[in-house]
């Protein structure tokens, strides 16, 4: 079994538009991205693009057996690895655009938190729109959405377009501090209250 970095790099070389990174995210980035997960209650937490599971581990630690954790991964080898590694997580090999349908199949109508590891800056405009439509329509009115961007992507037109789209789709968008202990360094976007 290859280690996570080897698997990640191999899948990146195979499908760079859906992986978007050459290595798994660090624990520091995972902690920053997963900050909105509530400490109490039975939240429905959706994770998009979990890859090899650095955010998954953080989400599981924060949930401590509460709620429902749905992880949606489009890459089949990574979905298999994730399901084997985290048996308590509801891992599904599917496209994130099917989020509403995936929640409904489980009797879950809305997500309280959506954590995204998707490579938004690598996506064309139409895909950014359709995926964010799926996300916002699946969220409860007070829900939180977090995602991240690598600092080298800041000047890209696709990254600027995505930031504008976040501001259009959410009442509140707050950029977090740069997480330097990640390869490459990244910063987090915290968005709340989807406009549907």
Give residue ranges: language-model regions.
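Class I SAM-dependent methyltransferase Rossmann-like catalytic core
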Residues: 4-40
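S-adenosyl-L-methionine
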Residues: 78-108
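Conserved class I S-adenosyl-L-methionine
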Residues: 42-51
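Conserved beta-strand signature within the Rossmann-like core of class I S-adenosyl-L-methionine
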Residues: 139-149
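Class I S-adenosyl-L-methionine
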Residues: 157-196
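Conserved SAM-binding motif I beta-strand of class I
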Residues: 68-73
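A short glycine-rich, Lys/Arg-flanked "PGG" loop and its adjoining helix->strand segment in the class I
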Residues: 129-141
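Conserved SAM-binding loop of SAM-dependent methyltransferases across substrates and taxa
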Residues: 52-65
């Amino acid at each position: 079994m290859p280690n996570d970095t080897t698997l990640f790099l191999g899948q990146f070389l195979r499908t760079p538009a859906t992986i978007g990174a050459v290595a798994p995210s660090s624990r520091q980035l995972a902690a920053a991205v997963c900050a909105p997960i509530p400490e109490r209650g039975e939240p429905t937490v959706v994770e998009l693009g979990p890859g090899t599971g650095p955010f998954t581990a953080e989400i599981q630690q924060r949930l401590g057996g509460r709620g429902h954790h749905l992880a949606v991964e489009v890459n089949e080898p990574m979905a298999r690895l994730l399901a084997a590694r985290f048996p308590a997580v509801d891992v599904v090999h599917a496209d994130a655009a099917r989020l509403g349908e995936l929640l409904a199949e489980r009797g879950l109508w809305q997500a309280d938190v959506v954590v995204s590891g998707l490579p938004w800056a690598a996506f064309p405009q139409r895909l950014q729109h359709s995926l964010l439509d799926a996300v916002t329509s699946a969220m409860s009115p007070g829900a939180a959405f977090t995602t991240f961007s690598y600092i080298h992507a800041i000047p890209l037109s696709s990254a600027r377009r995505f930031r504008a789209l976040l501001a259009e789709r959410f009442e509140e968008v707050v950029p977090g501090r740069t997480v330097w202990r990640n390869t490459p360094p990244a910063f987090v976007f915290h968005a709340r209250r989807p406009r549907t």
